[in-house]
Amino acid sequence: MAKQVFQTTFAGRELIVETGQVAKQANGSVVVRYGESTVLTAAVMSKKMATGDFFPLQVNYEEKMYAAGKFPGGFMKREGRPSTDATLTARLIDRPIRPMFAEGFRNEVQVINTVLSYDENASAPMAAMFGSSLALSISDIPFDGPIAGVQVGYVDGQIIINPSQEQAEQSLLELTVAGTKHAINMVESGAKELSEEIMLEALLKGHEAVKELIAFQEEIVAAVGKEKAEVELLHVDAELQAEIIAAYNSDLQKAVQVEEKLAREAATQAVKDQVTAVYEEKYANHEEFDRIMRDVAEILEQMEHAEVRRLITEDKVRPDGRKVDEIRPLDAVVDFLPRVHGSGLFTRGQTQALSVLTLAPMGETQIIDGLDPEYKKRFMHHYNFPQYSVGETGRYGAPGRREIGHGALGERALAQVLPSLEEFPYAIRLVAEVLESNGSSSQASICAGTLALMAGGVPIKAPVAGIAMGLISDGNNYTVLTDIQGLEDHFGDMDFKVAGTRDGITALQMDIKIQGITAEILTEALAQAKKARFEILDVIEATIPEVRPELAPTAPKIDTIKIDVDKIKIVIGKGGETIDKIIAETGVKIDIDEEGNVSIYSSDQDAINRAKEIIAGLVREAKVDEVYRAKVVRIEKFGAFVNLFDKTDALVHISEMAWTRTNRVEDLVEIGDEVDVKVIKIDEKGRIDASMKALLPRPPKPEHDEKGEKSERPHRPRHHKDHKPKKEFTETPKDSE
C-alpha cells in the first residue's frame, strides 16, 4: 500500500495521519502528527486463539527520550522500564479499547505506541489514543471501533479541549474523556473541588469533541481499511449449557444470595465443584475432555453472572441484601500506629485500608525526568494490594499497573486539598495498605489517607472521601448501585469512582464493560455518589473533627529562612564544604532552593536554632549606622581591623578611635580586645569603615584666645594607602573676592 496522508485541524492544532509508509508488516499501523508531537502506533494480532479465560490485550506507551531532545538518565543511558506516567497513559488507552472487542474473542492483541517527537503543547497521549483506535480500525483485527479521547480543562469558567501547557497549569480541571460516537466509555479526572454540574458539562463537551475525531477516523477507514479477519470466538456447547442450567441453577441462585463474602464464595464454589466432579466423571474418556471441561467452567461463570444481574434488575436485591443506594457499614480510626507521623484505618464492609503518613525534608521529593522538563514531585500516594487481602496466595514484587493506577487516583483526589509549599514546606508520602478487599479498595485508601493527613497535622483544606458506583444494564433498563462490592464490580457493567469534599469533586475514574453510557446515567450516578460521599464525610468528621494543630512528636520539625540568591554559594561553600559542616555540627537536614529559601529540618528544635544562627551569620551583612560588639583582630599604623561577625571585618581608622589625637593605635587597643563600633561607611567594593569615637560623648568645643584662634591645633588624621582621603577644596582669598 502506498503512503497516504490525511489532514484536519482539531482544537486549534494541525492533525495529520500517515499510513502505508512505515511498520507495514503489522496488521495495522499509523503515524499521527499532532502539533509537533509524533506518535507511531502499530497493532498486531496472534494467528490463533490464546489459552486462558481472558482476552490477552496488551497496550504499551513508550516514551523515547530523544523525542524531547534528552538523554535517558542512569548509568546505561538507555530507556528501561516504563515511567509511572507512561504506565498510566498505557492504562488510559487500554480502558476505552478493551470493551470494543467481541465477547469470547481470545486472540492475543498488542498495540504499541512509540512517541517519536514530543510537543508539550500538543498532547502525545491523546495522539496515541487516536492512533491506537485508528491502527486497529484500519487493520484486519476484529475491533468494533473507532474510539477517541480528548483532554478537557476548565480555565476562567470556560471548558477547553486539549489545553496547552500554560492553560493546563491554570486549569481547575484535568479530565480525560474517551468514547465511541454514541457514548462515553472511559473517564479519568482530577479537579479542584468542582461541582457535579461543571463536571457533567465538561464530560459532555469532551464527548462532542470525541465525535469530531471519530468522524475523521471513519473517513480514513473508508479509504484504507482492510476487511476484518474471521476469527474463532469462545463459544460453549448450547446443549451442555441447557443441561447444566436445568440441573444446577437453583442451587447456584441460593449460593449467590449468601450475604457474607467468604461464606458466599464458599457456597458458590461448592456448587461449581459439585458440577465439575459430575462432568469430569461423565466425560473422563471423551476425546474432547479438555474442551468440555472448559465449557463447564465457562457455563458456571455465565450462570453466576446472569443470576447476580437478575437479582439486582428484577428483584431489586443485592447479593449482600442492601438497597441499591445503601452504603456498607463504616468505621474510621486514627492513630492506629505509634511512632509514625500519622495513620488512619478505614473500613467499609469487608474492605479495609490502612494509610500511613510520612513527612520529610523537601530534599526527599521525587525528581521526575521524562519528556516534559524535569520537576520535583512533592506529594506521593502509593497503593499496595497484598494477596492476603482477598484470602489468596499470589505474586509479590514490584507494583503492577493496577496498583500504580489506583495509587495515582488517590493521589489526584487528595492533592487538591493539600496546603501550598509556602504554608507547609514538607515532602508528603502516603502509603495505603489494603488489608481486606471486597470492592472499592481504592476509594477506601482515599478515606484512610484523609484520616492520616488530619491525624498527622497536615493542614488540608477539607476532608476528602471516595465512593465507587456501579451499573447493571440490560440495554433497555438500568440500575445504578452505590458502593459496589467485588461481585457487583466483577459482573456489573461499570465501575465509576467519585472522590471529593463537601464543596466539590476532586477526582473521577470510570471504566465500563459495555460500549458506552448516556448522560442520563452519568447524572444519576453523580447525584448518588454525592449523597454517599457526604455520609462518609460524616463518619470521618465524627472521628477527627479537624486537623490536629501540631505535628506528631516523631515528625521532623522545620524552620525556614530567606537569603539572597547571591548568598547561596556562601552557605553551600566550595564542593558543599560549608553546608556539610553545618549538618555535621548540628545534625539537621538542610534544603536550599534556587530562590534562596533555606529549609532546616530536625526533630530537635535546639539543633534547628543553632543551624539558623550559623546560616544567618554566614549571610549577614553589615549596615551603616548599626552598632556591633567587635573584636580587634589586626593592628596597623593607620588603624585597627575588627571582626564584626563571622568573616566580616571593618577598619577603625586611628582618627576614629577617640576624639583626642592619638599617635599610636596600641595606646588605645590591643589584639583580642572587644570594643563597640558603629559602621559609618561601606564603599562600592564592600569595604567597611567603622568608628569607636562615634559612640563616645563628644568633648566640649575648645575655648578661643583673644585673637579669635583656637587654643589647640586642629586634628588632621593620617590616611593609609587603602583609605585615601578625598580631596578637599577650600576657598582662597582670591576666590572669595
From Swiss-Prot:
Residue ranges of domain S1 motif in the record: 625-693
Domain of life where this protein originates: Bacteria
GO biological process, one term: mRNA catabolic process
Binding site for Mg(2+): 489, 495
Start and end residues of each stretch annotated as Disordered: 691-737
Enzyme class: transferase
Compartments where located: Cytoplasm
Keywords of this entry: Cytoplasm, Magnesium, Metal-binding, Nucleotidyltransferase, RNA-binding, Transferase
Compositional bias per record (Basic residues), positions renumbered to this chain: 715-724
Basic and acidic residues bias: start-end ranges: 700-714, 725-737
SMART domains in alphabetical order: KH, S1
Gene Ontology molecular function, alphabetical: 3'-5'-RNA exonuclease activity; magnesium ion binding; polyribonucleotide nucleotidyltransferase activity; RNA binding
Coiled coil: none
Cofactor(s) listed in the protein's UniProt record: Mg(2+)
EC code(s) of this entry: 2.7.7.8
Domain KH intervals: 556-615
Catalysed conversion reaction: RNA(n+1) + phosphate = RNA(n) + a ribonucleoside 5'-diphosphate
CC annotations in GO: cytosol
PANTHER family per UniProt: POLYRIBONUCLEOTIDE NUCLEOTIDYLTRANSFERASE (PTHR11252), POLYRIBONUCLEOTIDE NUCLEOTIDYLTRANSFERASE 1, MITOCHONDRIAL (PTHR11252:SF0)
Family to which the UniProt record says this protein belongs: Belongs to the polyribonucleotide nucleotidyltransferase family.
Function in brief: Involved in mRNA degradation. Catalyzes the phosphorolysis of single-stranded polyribonucleotides processively in the 3'- to 5'-direction.
Name used for this protein in its record: Polyribonucleotide nucleotidyltransferase
Species, as recorded: Streptococcus pneumoniae (strain 70585)
Name of the encoding gene: pnp
